């Protein structure tokens, strides 16, 4: 099994921890020696009551859920792990603009993601993802689609 397939399969497992009833996204951030530095999935912030049904419904959920990519960044920061020169493997398409900026600023140099947005509400993210690709290209972050 090649590394890409290995880490994507781990991200697929990580996403299953999400309590989002409609969309599950996973992220695995890996160092230059193929060591796992951090993982993340879309979720409510730590300590927030995740049993409030209204927080699961669109558009309300967009105020409450954190994205997998940013959760992986925050998880690394909480334990003092540098993400400099790392690669992130996603179970989704391109990250949104907010996540793309976070990945760039945290030192990620490569993103491996699906060619197309796979969320049920992909239209909401199209414009953000188009801009994030421009940002990633200008900032020298390699994008590999699978």
Give residue ranges: language-model regions.
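Zinc-dependent deaminase catalytic domain
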Residues: 1-146
């Amino acid at each position: 099994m090649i590394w890409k397939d290995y880490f994507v399969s781990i991200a697929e497992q990580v996403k299953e921890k999400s309590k989002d009833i409609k969309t599950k996204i996973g992220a695995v951030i890996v160092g230059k020696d193929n060591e796992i530095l951090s993982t993340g999935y879309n979720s409510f912030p730590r300590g927030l009551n995740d049993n409030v049904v209204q927080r699961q419904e669109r558009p309300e959920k967009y105020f409450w859920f954190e994205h997998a990519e940013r959760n992986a960044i925050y998880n690394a920061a909480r334990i003092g792990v540098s993400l400099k020169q790392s690669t992130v493997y996603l179970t989704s398409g391109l990250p949104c603009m907010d996540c793309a900026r976070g990945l760039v600023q945290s030192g990620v140099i490569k993103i491996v993601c699906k060619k197309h947005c796979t969320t049920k509400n992909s239209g909401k993210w199209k414009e953000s993802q188009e801009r994030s690709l421009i940002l990633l290209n200008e900032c020298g972050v390699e994008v590999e689609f699978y």
